[in-house]
Structure formats: structure tokens, C-alpha cells
């Protein structure tokens, strides 16, 4: 899961050094000694969209938790903000066009994802367009009554409980 760098034609492609963006910067192997490379957790985003006391969930097409329901979301790609990532992931998985409304929270338990240490940043979003249709790595996309949710993947049950506390404030 933890990737520091990889080789391109005998040179090193550094993705992130000391928290600064070095997008597509090629660094010679001998110059890499100047930098200390660290293993980092992966960063993911999840989105909460509510409509008529129902919450949008997707059925996962792939492992981990294949066949389980989850909040729509995924990994942040290099060069995008977390807000851009959550909008992209929701478009890809549900067909809806969302707009970020608020930050709900950050979930960072090292064991929340069986693939490794993944930090998830969770946003509350409004729908501004699109049509609900499962896509990308979502087998299904549908709204579920907040009082009758299916078994959820990862720590998404905790996230939804936190959302309900935020909502009822």
C-alpha cells in the first residue's frame, strides 16, 4: 500500500516529498539521497448525500467488502484536492453531480481498512445534477432509509452515526 516512489527510465519519479507537491517531477537517483522518504497512509474521501431522510449508498463491486454497501468514495489522486476527489468519486460511482456542503470529519484509525492505513475525509454534499446510476466500481447505487440501513463496509456505520449527531445537532 505504501509507495514512496517508482522508476521511470532509470530515474526516480517522486510523488510527494516533505508534504510539498512535486507532481511529475523527475529526480535523479543520486539526488534522492538529499531527501528522507517516509511511508505514508493513503488518503481517501467519502461522501454523504441525504434526500428525504434517506442516505445514498453504493454496493461495492470489488474487494474489500465486495457485495457490501458503503458510502460513495475512493482514493484521492495526485494533483487533486480532497474536495475535487469526493466530487469525482461520487460522479463516477453514482452518476450524480454533487457540490460540497460541509466537512463532517476525518477518520484515521489505522485498522479501518484491511488494505492498510487509510485516512478518510468525509464530506456532506448536495446534489446539483446528474441521474442516479451505478458506475465505476459500484454495482448498485440507491438511497436507504436512515433508520433501516444494510450492513455497511469499513467504519461507515460509525460515520453515519456521527452524521446523525451532526444533523440533529
From Swiss-Prot:
Segments forming domain Nudix hydrolase: 38-168
Binding site for Mg(2+) 1: 73, 93
EC main group: hydrolase
GO function terms (MF aspect): ADP-ribose diphosphatase activity; metal ion binding
Cofactor binding description: Binds 3 Mg(2+) ions per subunit.
Protein EC: 3.6.1.13
PROSITE patterns: NUDIX, NUDIX_BOX
Binding site for substrate: 12-13, 35-36, 109-111
Positions of short motif Nudix box: 74-95
pH effects: Optimum pH is 4.85.
Residues that hold Mg(2+) 2 according to the record: 89
Top-rank taxon: Archaea
InterPro entries linked: Nudix_hydrolase (IPR020476), NUDIX_hydrolase-like_dom_sf (IPR015797), NUDIX_hydrolase_CS (IPR020084), NUDIX_hydrolase_dom (IPR000086)
Residues at which Mg(2+) 3 binds: 89, 93, 142
Cofactor(s) listed: Mg(2+)
Temperature behavior of the protein's activity: Thermostable.
Active site annotation, chain numbering: 140 (proton acceptor)
Keywords associated with the record: Hydrolase, Magnesium, Metal-binding
Reactions it catalyzes: ADP-D-ribose + H2O = D-ribose 5-phosphate + AMP + 2 H(+)
Signal peptide: none
Stated family: Belongs to the Nudix hydrolase family. NudF subfamily.
Protein name: ADP-ribose pyrophosphatase
Organism annotation: Methanocaldococcus jannaschii (strain ATCC 43067 / DSM 2661 / JAL-1 / JCM 10045 / NBRC 100440)
Amino acid at each position: 500500500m505504501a509507495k514512496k516512489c517508482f522508476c521511470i527510465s532509470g530515474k526516480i519519479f517522486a510523488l510527494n516529498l516533505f508534504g510539498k507537491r512535486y507532481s511529475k517531477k523527475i529526480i535523479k537517483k543520486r539526488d534522492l539521497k538529499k531527501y528522507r522518504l517516509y511511508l505514508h497512509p493513503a488518503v481517501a474521501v467519502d461522501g454523504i448525500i441525504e434526500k428525504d431522510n434517506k442516505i445514498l449508498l453504493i454496493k461495492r463491486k470489488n474487494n474489500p467488502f465486495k457485495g457490501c454497501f458503503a458510502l460513495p468514495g475512493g482514493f484521492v489522486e495526485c494533483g487533486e484536492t480532497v474536495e475535487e476527489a469526493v466530487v469525482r468519486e461520487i460522479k463516477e460511482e453514482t452518476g450524480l453531480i454533487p457540490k460540497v456542503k460541509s466537512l463532517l470529519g476525518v477518520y484515521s484509525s489505522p485498522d479501518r481498512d484491511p488494505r492498510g492505513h487509510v485516512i478518510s475525509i468525509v464530506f456532506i454534499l448536495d446534489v446539483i445534477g446528474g441521474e442516479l446510476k451505478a458506475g465505476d466500481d459500484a454495482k448498485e447505487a440507491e438511497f436507504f432509509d436512515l433508520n433501516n440501513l444494510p450492513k455497511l463496509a469499513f467504519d461507515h456505520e460509525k460515520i453515519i452515526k456521527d452524521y446523525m449527531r451532526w444533523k440533529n445537532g
